[in-house]
Swiss-Prot record:
Residues 713-976 are annotated as: ATP-dependent helicase. Residues 538-561 are annotated as: Disordered. It is found in: Host endoplasmic reticulum membrane. Belongs to the bromoviridae replication protein 1a family. This is Replication protein 1a. It comes from Cucumber mosaic virus (strain Y) (CMV). It holds the Pfam family Vmethyltransf. Its main location: host cell. One of its GO terms (cellular component) is host cell endoplasmic reticulum membrane. Keywords: ATP-binding, Helicase, Host endoplasmic reticulum, Host membrane, Hydrolase, Membrane, Methyltransferase, Nucleotide-binding, Transferase. Residues 683-839 form the (+)RNA virus helicase ATP-binding domain.
Length: 993
């Protein structure tokens, strides 16, 4: 192995953040070393959620865990507390991911109150403490036993020799020792201190858990957690719930209220509109997670950290440390963002006006009610008349109103029991303000008593007022502060933590011991992993279930089993050059001229079409003016091109601009080009990406015909064309060029784990980006999906980069570059390589796809045509994957977030997108999971559905290239759903064969 001629450390030190070469080399080396481990981790991060979730609930769970797990929302079954159950599963996996998952005994994890069957079925190294505290716990144990039996019967070999690891003792009584623990909604019955004592009994150092959280519990008696659709209420006695009409004897004999009778405050969690089991827990235990910070117990000090609060679920961790703890002030805040728009209003709680209570009311409601009441206030009116005015205004600001046949909520509804008291408090508050203002006015002509009182010093005035208030309590509400209370949006807790636990903890020695132990355990795990990999590689390709919907572990296992074959470079068998250099240069020069003429033709066609529309609408080449018939003209063109639009000088568009669409250019009397917001102009679909004129002029900027070698690796679909690019890429000499932006983003993510970083955008660019922008020169170009490029475009890229070698990857039999204008005579678009190599082994396509593609090639290709698909083979484990079914309309298409949908035409794609919008599916689904066959070239998915919604003539279903792309996008299942019979449909003919 050759010795490196430069020092990486010196290179990075000298260039700093500009050392792209060193950064790219480190990324490349790291990727090669960790590729197999990352594949294993990706398999473990797939989470299947069977509960049926609405669009809003799906967004909640994707926002919380979508970046960490590969979520599969299968929408299989309705379940009570659907979102809460899904969050509980993801929360369990999230907490487990915080700890080592080696399977070694020293990495055992405890679960206080969790579901042991979940860990058993997933093979987690977890011991569950699942005590039977009541009938509900015993019911759960029985249900878990039956679920375990049902799953084992379906796949007994997977669970052979595996035993569930759990006990029915309380967490503090269990003797199993472990460094790590989790508690998923298990802290309600234990409290913060109870969890700390359980950790001490188990020798646990770190615990991570989750619980439902609402900061309003600190000051309210009831509230709602909207994301979980859960209502909570504090219960202080057996008679506090007025909705409960159970007889008194039944209440006193019930299990819940037998505890409540002991004057404990309980918190009941009820799920709204779900007549299911509720949960009742001790308020002191729940409050401890909000107020407590540390707890010292038997030589250990435990501290809690509140990590993430999202969707009404708080994730926290408790860490225990031994030895002495120096004094330290620990501070934390509990925030109440839900009350920022409210103000506290004191209302009478007794007729003698001595006892008052505080209620919350919207600041806007109080302000508007008081404003109108002040204007209508008249001291000569009876107090009842004033009261009626205030109640009328208050009712209007807190009731449902109807506008144009639509009901709207004005303000916020007020409790029926407090409604009149709130109005009375506002009346007193209004009268008090008038009196205060009157006193200020009377100060100019004050009496002798007023002058004497004003002459007193402030301490004497305060003392005098206090004596009067004490002797005459009914005068108390005559101060403003007794009516309006400013509600704080947070509560602060300060706690001084110190503990004398004896000797000081030697952190340095502990770190050395943990590091040594981890190295030893890592070697053991590496040896075990190597043995398993060797056994897997030695096994022949085995047959899986005949069910087309069975996903198993096929996609990722295929990557592991076939990893060795993918590392073999297809470049080793490239043939030598056989054509004359003069002939090659002439072909390339001709292709470059043709591509320049083609782009110029597209630009001229765009200008001609826009000019025709402009003139038909009444415009000309001299003035910016359109006549009244423009609506008829644009409505007619809109049926052909939905992107046709008019921009007026006021900034208004005739039709709403689709989301995400920007028109950089437009057309008016000054021609086609960039326009300002104050201009009148028209646009069409060609104005979204209008670079044809720039591309046509690039070839005149001293671009000479390249003389370097063009090598092409012509591989079948799924042969792993991206892997060789990653393996042979050298940042110092290479640049990766793709045909479109989507391919560039995929390569950047595969190579740099980022699609927009500086390094990724420097080394991976589209062909148009290279031609239109400044770029460094390189000696070698790596071209991905080269068949989508015009030959002249490839030659121009080589000339611009001054490359002496172009290594091109692509399938010559898939969809190639095609002219967007049928009137242009295209002759030199096909790539003419100097060296070629074939790759006939696919790692993506299942076994049954191979004969189907052969049959399609026999039917569609002319006789005597040589196709590499006549001898291609598959290394996939999946035996059967292709199914088909007839449907009556688009409403019968089963839209599932786990599947990828493709169509041959844009019309069918638009119909699917409309159907997805009707079903309220997320925007990401119909933006990313529905594509045309042309748009999906280069994409690989587990489950693919091809949809044909019309039986009218469509030549694309007769073309081998389009049908080939459609049938080779999947790794596990392919479903063809079609409406009616279409003559010459290749896919339908082979799917039924």
């Amino acid at each position: 192995m050759a010795t490196s001629s430069f020092n990486i450390n010196e290179l990075v030190a000298s260039h700093g953040d500009k050392g792209l070469l060193a950064t790219a080399l480190v990324d490349k080396t790291t990727h090669e070393q960790l590729e197999e481990q990352l594949q294993h981790q990706r398999r473990g991060r797939k989470v299947y959620i069977r509960n049926v979730l609405g669009v809003k609930d799906s967004e909640v769970i994707r926002n919380r865990y979508g970046g960490k797990y590969d979520l599969h929302l299968t929408q299989q079954e309705f379940a009570s507390q659907g979102l809460a159950g899904a969050l509980r599963l993801c929360g369990t996996l999230d907490c487990l991911d915080s700890f080592p998952s080696s399977g070694l005994r020293q990495d055992l994890v405890l679960d206080f109150g969790g579901s042991w069957v979940t860990h058993y079925l997933r093979g987690h190294n977890v011991h569950c403490c699942s005590p039977c505290l009541g009938i509900r716990d015993k019911m759960r144990h029985s249900e878990r036993l039956m679920n375990m039996r049902k799953i084992i019967l379906n796949d007994p070999q997977q669970f052979d020799g595996r035993q569930p690891d759990f006990c029915t003792q309380p967490a503090a009584d269990c003797k199993v020792q472990a460094h790590f623990a989790i508690s998923i909604h298990g802290g309600y019955d234990m409290g913060f201190r109870g969890l700390c004592e359980a950790m001490n009994a188990h020798g646990t150092t770190i615990l991570k858990g989750t619980m439902m959280f609402d900061g309003a519990m600190m000051f309210d008696d009831q509230g709602v957690i909207p994301e979980l659709n859960c209502q909570w209420r504090k219960i202080r006695s057996a008679f506090s719930e007025t909705e409960d009409v159970t007889p008194l004897v039944g209440k006193l004999n019930s299990t819940v209220f037998s505890r409540v009778r002991k004057f404990k405050t309980m918190v009941a969690f009820d799920f709204i509109n779900e007549s299911t089991m509720s949960y009742v827990h001790d308020w002191e235990n729940i409050k401890s997670f909000l107020t407590d910070q540390t707890y010292s117990y038997r030589g250990m000090t435990y501290g809690i950290e509140r990590c993430v609060i999202h969707a009404g679920i708080m994730t926290y961790k408790i860490i225990g440390v031994p030895g002495m703890c120096p004094p330290e002030l620990i501070r934390h805040c509990i925030w109440f963002p839900s009350i920022k728009d409210y103000v506290g209003l004191k209302i009478p709680a007794s007729q003698d006006l001595v006892e008052w209570k505080t209620v919350r009311i919207l600041t806007s409601t109080l302000r508007e009610t008081e404003e109108i009441a002040m204007r209508c206030y008249n001291d000569k009116k009876a107090w009842m008349e004033q009261f009626k005015v205030i109640l009328g205004v208050l009712s209007a600001k807190s009731s449902t109103i109807v506008i144009n046949g639509m009901s709207m909520q004005s303000g916020e509804r007020i409790d029926i029991n407090d409604y009149h008291y709130i109005g009375f408090a506002i009346l007193l508050h209004t009268k008090m303000k008038y009196e205060q203002l009157g006193k200020m006015y009377d100060m100019w002509n004050a009496s002798s008593i007023s002058k004497w009182f004003a002459a007193l010093t402030r301490p004497l005035r305060v003392f005098f007022s206090s004596v009067v208030h004490a002797l005459f309590p009914t005068l108390r509400p005559r101060e403003e502060k007794e009516f309006l209370i400013k509600l704080s949006t947070f509560v602060t807790f300060n706690e001084e933590c110190s503990f004398d636990g004896g000797e000081e903890w030697d952190v340095i020695s502990s770190a050395a011991y943990v590091a040594t132990q981890a190295v030893t355990d890592g070697k053991i795990l590496a040896a075990q992993k190597a043995e398993k990999l060797a056994e897997k590689l030695a096994q022949p390709v085995s047959e899986v279930s005949d069910s087309p919907e069975t996903s198993s572990q096929t996609p990722d296992d295929t990557a592991d089993v076939c990893g060795k074959e993918r590392e073999v470079s297809e470049l080793d068998s490239l043939s030598a050059q056989t054509r004359s250099p003069i002939t090659r240069v002439a072909e390339r020069a001709t292709a470059m001229l043709e591509y320049a003429a083609y782009e110029k033709h597209l630009h001229d066609t765009t200008v001609s079409n826009l000019k025709r529309i402009w003139n038909m609408a009444g415009g000309d080449d001299k003035r910016s003016f359109l006549e009244g018939n423009l609506k008829f003209v644009f409505d007619s063109y809109f049926t052909v091109d939905p992107m046709v639009n008019i921009h007026f000088s006021t900034g208004r568009w005739v039709r709403p601009v689709p989301e995400g669409i920007v028109y950089p250019v437009g057309y008016n009397e000054r021609g086609l080009g960039p326009k300002s917001d104050g201009e009148l102009y028209i646009v069409n679909s060609e104005c979204v990406i209008c670079n044809s004129e720039s591309l046509s002029t690039v070839y005149g900027r001293s671009l000479q015909t390249p003389t370097g070698t063009i090598s092409q690796v012509d591989g079948v679909a799924g042969c792993g064309k991206t892997m060789p690019i990653k393996s042979i890429f050298e940042p110092s000499t290479d640049m990766i060029v793709t045909a479109n932006k989507k391919s560039a983003q995929d390569v950047r993510m595969a190579l740099f784990k980022s699609s927009d970083s500086k390094e990724a955008c420097t080394f991976v660019r589209t062909a148009d980006s290279v031609l239109l922008n400044e770029c460094p020169t390189v000696s070698r170009v790596l071209e991905d999906e080269v068949v989508l490029l015009h030959f002249g475009q490839l030659c121009a890229v080589m000339s611009k980069l001054k490359a002496v070698r172009a290594i091109c990857f692509g399938d010559a039999e898939q969809i190639a570059f095609s002219s967007r204008d049928a009137s242009f005579d295209m002759r030199f678009s096909k790539i003419i390589p100097d060296e070629t190599s074939d790759a006939d082994t696919t790692f993506r396509s299942p076994q049954d796809v191979v004969p189907l593609v052969r049959l399609m090639a026999t039917k569609a290709l002319p006789k005597g045509t040589h196709s590499k698909y006549t001898k291609w083979v598959s290394q996939s484990k999946v035996r059967r994957s292709v199914t088909s079914r007839a449907i009556a309309s688009v409403t019968l298409v089963d839209l599932d977030s786990s599947r990828f949908y493709i169509t041959m035409t844009q019309a069918d794609k638009a119909s699917l997108i409309s159907r997805a919008k009707e079903m309220n599916l997320p925007k990401t689904f119909w933006n990313e999971r529905i594509k045309t066959v042309h748009e999906s070239q280069g994409i690989s998915e587990d489950h693919v559905t091809l949809v044909r919604l019309k039986s009218t003539k469509c030549d694309l279903f007769k073309q081998f290239s389009y049908c080939l792309v459609a049938l080779t996008r999947h790794k596990v299942t392919f479903r063809y759903e079609y409406c009616g019979v279409l003559n010459g449909d290749l896919i339908a003919s082979v799917a039924r064969a």
